[in-house]
Amino acid sequence: MPLIELCNIRKRYPAGDQDVEVLHGIDLSIEAGEFLAIMGSSGSGKSTLMHILGCLDQPSDGEYRFSGQPVTAMDHDQLAWLRREMFGFVFQSYHLIGTASAWENVALPAIYAGVPREERKQRAQQLLTDLGLEDRLENRPSQLSGGQQQRVSIARALMNGGKVILADEPTGALDSASGEAVMDQLRSLAEQGHTVIVITHDAKVAAHADRVVEIHDGNLISDTRHHDHLHERAKPVSAPPKESVMPDPGEVMEAVVMALRSLRANWMRTLLTLLGIVIGVGAVVVMLAIGEGAKQDVVAQINERGTNLLVVRPDRGMQRVADGVIATLVPADAQALESLPNISIAVPEISGNVTARANGMDISTSVQAVSEDFPSLRDWQPVQGIFFGEEDLKSYSPVAVIGQTVKENLFPEGDPLGQFLLLDSIPFQVIGVMSAQGASDRGEDQDDVVIVPLSTGTLRLFGQNYLNSITVAVDDVTQIDATEAAAVALLTQRHGKQDVRVFNMASLLEMVSETQNTLTALLGSIAAISLLVGGIGVMNIMLVSVTERIHEIGIRMATGARQRNILQQFLTESVVVSALGGIVGVVIGVLVGWLLMLFGMAIVFSVPVMVVSFVCAAGIGLLFGFAPALKAARLNPVEALSND
């Protein structure tokens, strides 16, 4: 049974509205171990015939059998298996990858055969040594002469065994001495049992072969044998197997290595591609950190006031007394509210602004007249002295507890305890200093305050008994809504109408949290758009990369790369560059966040956000890299090789 059998092979190419046929019914049989030359002038169809023989192209009509197996019925992976395991190509233009060393070019077919890196490196170096290139192992093609490059090409053809060597004008770009050396090497391979097929226009080159087939205008016109016997060591061949669609882990790692090499070779383009992803990921990290910081800041301030609180205020539409206070709430209402189930404390409050004077200094500050339960309600205790008690309220004691700001302004050097200050010319004795609170959620200084007993304030400072608010603490927060309804009902009954409004701090916290979550989502969406734009940039750059590397893709396909290998390689490059951008983006986002923290902005980083941002960056590389990678994988090997 012939190793190669062509029956009525025709090949047509589209030319406008018509097809041009370049091979006209070729019939050819080649036995294993033959040294055959296919000779013809330029345009005779000999290169097209070689492409069909080497499974780089498919015939338009006819039947091609390899080792009895119908090649025309094989799928892409089986054709790649034949190119990888059976054929070895020696091209006139060498077709070496410019960014790879000599041994790496030779080892290329073994990558797609799944040979471990060290094993293929040793074999590649041994092949080059056998061909006299032991001192050129690390040289790139640009550092080699034409003859040396052709020997690298021969070594590559032998990397996986090269049972069939297809040499297309192997001496065409060489001087006579180098050309003769190459033909001697091909003769030696034939003597070792390889099937050698040389494509040439030169009769002197064809004379080295045992059999010469001449082609003219797409027709075989002669078939001459110089020797009638085959070499005794002709190598047996097998049919291509069905291959697994699952990639080998070694293939993935090799794809990563090749991706890093390719990205390093075009570092400026890689940097520009990274920039879009870096900006997108960094923006996501910073924006969400700002949003989360703002949310937690507001929530913390609400929590400081207590989420178990109900604040009862007069309805703004109610009647006002002469000084503008709404005449609705009175201290007795607070006592009534304390009688309700689930209410532990009810603190009445009157507040206003006064001029405070002490030690010859005047300041404008706020004053709060409250009951003795105020520190417990607000979880705000004195750090010096004491807070007034029930007896002080009963006796209308002229005592005061001051905030830290008032202390610093009126008593900058001395101990304020026991000293007097005037509030609108009314003397009060300082009995305590509250702990520092800082600014409120509205930016107000909570330490710029003087706190006095409610009874004293109503009598001596405000001259009226109507309250600004009553703050209620509930025992069971899960029942806070029911307690709120009960409070409104009680006060409506007492006043004969509904003239109050109740502010639920738990509901306020929930509302603020939802608002902040919406704001954070908005900020994240804006940042995600930047990441999306970065992904489009990745796709554009990868499309450019595919266009620039069509020739390299052709070389890889000729040496046995499957479509999935090409797809995997370009997808890996896209994912690697996006993942690198994701890592750098996270780092830069954290650095920018820390910088903003130095300026007092509330920033809260989230590790899950960083992880998700990185994963999204890699996912964007996968998503936007798929179209360019698919384009590369679907290239025709012959067309890709001719794109130089």
From Swiss-Prot:
Single Gene Ontology BP annotation: response to antibiotic
Pfam families according to UniProt: ABC_tran, FtsX, MacB_PCD
EC number: 7.6.2.-
Protein location: Cell inner membrane
InterPro entries cross-referenced by the UniProt entry: AAA+_ATPase, ABC3_permease_C, ABC_transporter-like_ATP-bd, ABC_transporter-like_CS, MacB-like_ATP-bd, MacB_PCD, Macrolide_Exporter_MacB, P-loop_NTPase
Residue ranges of domain ABC transporter in the record: 4-242
Binding site for ATP: G40, S41, S42, G43, S44, G45, K46, S47
Annotated protein name in UniProt: Macrolide export ATP-binding/permease protein MacB
Organism: Alcanivorax borkumensis (strain ATCC 700651 / DSM 11573 / NCIMB 13689 / SK2)
